[in-house]
From Swiss-Prot:
Region (Disordered) residue spans: 86-105
GO terms assigned for molecular function: large ribosomal subunit rRNA binding; structural constituent of ribosome
Organism in which the protein naturally occurs: Chelativorans sp. (strain BNC1)
Family matches, as Gene3D superfamilies: Ribosomal protein L11, C-terminal domain (1.10.10.250), Ribosomal protein L11/L12, N-terminal domain (3.30.1550.10)
Subunit structure: Part of the ribosomal stalk of the 50S ribosomal subunit. Interacts with L10 and the large rRNA to form the base of the stalk. L10 forms an elongated spine to which L12 dimers bind in a sequential fashion forming a multimeric L10(L12)X complex.
Signal peptide residue numbers: none
Function statement: Forms part of the ribosomal stalk which helps the ribosome interact with GTP-bound translation factors.
Record InterPro entries: Ribosomal_uL11 (IPR000911), Ribosomal_uL11_bac-typ (IPR006519), Ribosomal_uL11_C (IPR020783), Ribosomal_uL11_C_sf (IPR036769), Ribosomal_uL11_CS (IPR020785), Ribosomal_uL11_N (IPR020784), Ribosomal_uL11_N_sf (IPR036796)
Domain of life of the organism encoding this protein: Bacteria
Name of encoding gene: rplK
Protein name, UniProt field: Large ribosomal subunit protein uL11
Post-translational modification: One or more lysine residues are methylated.
HAMAP family membership: Ribosomal_uL11 (MF_00736)
GO CC terms, sorted: cytosolic large ribosomal subunit
Amino acid sequence: MAKKIAGQLKLQVPAGSATPSPPIGPALGQRGINIMEFCKAFNAQSQDLEKGSPIPVVITYYQDKSFTFTMKTPPVSYFLKKAANLKSGSKEPGKQSAGQISRAKVREIAETKMKDLNANDVEAAMRMVEGSARSMGLEVVG
């Protein structure tokens, strides 16, 4: 018989550095999920990723207090800030430019994020990434 799902939880956890401290500990503890078991499993799976990059994780927990989780790729904004060497986007996107990013970098980001985006081809994924860049105040050149 299949396990009965009790719910889902979405978190953004830095790669390789999941700890029982807030915000992870309280979010998992409230739902009766073994915090240390999650931290060890997450850190083991994310050890080959860039340390500290924010990894969206979807945790499915069951009524018997067990859980499974899936990791996604870091957010588009993380890749854009990294590619443009920015700390944050523009305070007034559309009026004030935060920097520039090449179409080649946009394509690279789109190919990396392709499995998580709701796009059928790379061109559609590129348009989504360009939209994110514009909303951050980045100018797409080339």
